[in-house]
A protein has these predicted regions:
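Alpha-helical linker/hinge and terminal dimerization helices associated
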Residues: 60-61, 82-104, 306
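Central regulatory/effector-binding core of bacterial HTH transcription factors
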Residues: 110-171
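Secondary-structure junction motif
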Residues: 122-123, 201, 210-231, 299-307, ...
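Hydrophobic hinge/microswitch elements
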Residues: 150-151, 156-160, 165-166, 217-277
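Short helix-boundary/capping micro-motifs
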Residues: 28-46
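A short LG(V/I)-centered, amphipathic sequence patch enriched
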Residues: 58-77
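Flexible hinge/capping segments at coil-to-helix
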Residues: 174-211
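A late-sequence structural motif
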Residues: 276-319
């Protein structure tokens, strides 16, 4: 099937003109790679030709879109706006292609989902993939789990359709749907002389205990920092770890204890070859897990199907 390579949009004077969609793709690659030179290599085109495409885009929109420097390129305010719309346009074109190809058949298309690490969301990835493949084999699921990305920004830019993350907003351009409250648990080796008790362990009793936690920008660390500050308890972080598997091995080896949401605490206990103490923390530390989508761009049919599966899986965690 022949796919149209142009989109119709208004020029600076408001007159509808045709734009080669490849220019939008090229613009996205330039921004994502951070360099026109790298983008030219990735796109397998000459750098002067790519620069001409960028110049044509800037002429069309009547604004400078990128600022070049020795460090690479950065977007202007106009560039941010064009980047966001370019992502949406290309996603809609891809979905139109998938819908046309699957007309009369099952759902098809690409759906991007962000799952925040160190949370129940991170434990759902395999189940989400399995259920999506089982129910909608035509859907290409793109899962990302990263501490270095701002998922809300990626949703606004059209790079993600949805994300499970902590917080309830508000963030302009993103709609938050609270779906789960996560309680935090202490996980420690028996050598730390913490009793295996069903009762919550007081934060005050953890004064000076060596802890393994994520860096300060991580939501887990912020929640723990707040709890220790409020109870005027000395927080002793001996290492900052952002890899759950490494964290599990370190806790199991007695290198330090940790405080994590229940889903991650359970995973650490299950992966350890050593018996570990796992107790709820008091005063209670908890964070709200929300399903986030754009409040401006409606979800595609495939994305709605994936959203339904996500809600089913998180409902199981509550039970």
């Amino acid at each position: 099937m022949r796919v149209c390579k142009h989109v119709s949009c208004a020029g600076q004077n408001g007159t509808p003109i045709l734009m080669d969609i490849r220019r939008l793709k090229s613009f996205i690659v330039i921004v994502d790679s951070g360099s026109i030179t790298r983008a030219a290599d990735l796109l397998h085109i000459a750098q002067p030709a790519l620069s001409q495409q960028l110049a044509a885009l800037e002429e069309h929109f009547g604004h400078k879109l990128l600022i070049r420097s020795q460090q690479g390129v950065s977007m202007t305010d106009a560039g941010h706006a064009v980047y966001r719309h370019a992502q949406i346009i290309l996603r809609q074109m891809e979905q139109a292609q998938a819908d046309a190809s699957a007309a009369g058949n099952s759902l098809a298309g690409r759906v991007s989902v962000g799952l925040v690490p160190f949370s129940s969301a991170a434990t759902l990835s395999v189940d989400l993939l399995a259920e999506t493949r089982k129910r909608h084999p035509g859907i290409l699921l793109h899962l990302t789990e990263s501490v270095g990305q701002t998922y809300s920004q990626m949703i606004m830019n059209g790079r993600l359709e949805m994300a499970l993350l902590h917080g309830t907003g508000p963030i302009k351009g993103v709609r938050f749907e609270p779906i789960l409250s996560e309680e935090f648990f202490l996980v420690a080796h028996r050598d730390f002389a913490i009793e295996a008790d069903a009762k919550p362990v007081s934060v005050n009793t953890l004064d000076g205990i060596p802890l393994l936690l994520p860096p300060a920008y991580n939501f887990v660390r912020r929640a723990v920092d707040t709890a220790f500050t409020r109870t005027r308890t000395n927080l002793k972080v001996v290492a900052e770890v952002e890899i759950v598997r490494t964290l599990a091995r370190a806790v199991g080896s007695g290198l330090g204890a940790t405080i994590m949401p229940k889903a991650i605490a359970d995973r650490i206990v299950s992966e350890s070859s050593e018996p570990l103490i796992c107790r709820l923390v008091s005063p209670r530390i908890e964070e709200t897990l929300s399903l986030c989508v754009s409040d401006q761009n409606p979800l595609s049919e495939p994305a709605l199907a994936v959203r339904d599966i996500l809600l089913e899986l998180t409902a199981r965690l509550k039970g």
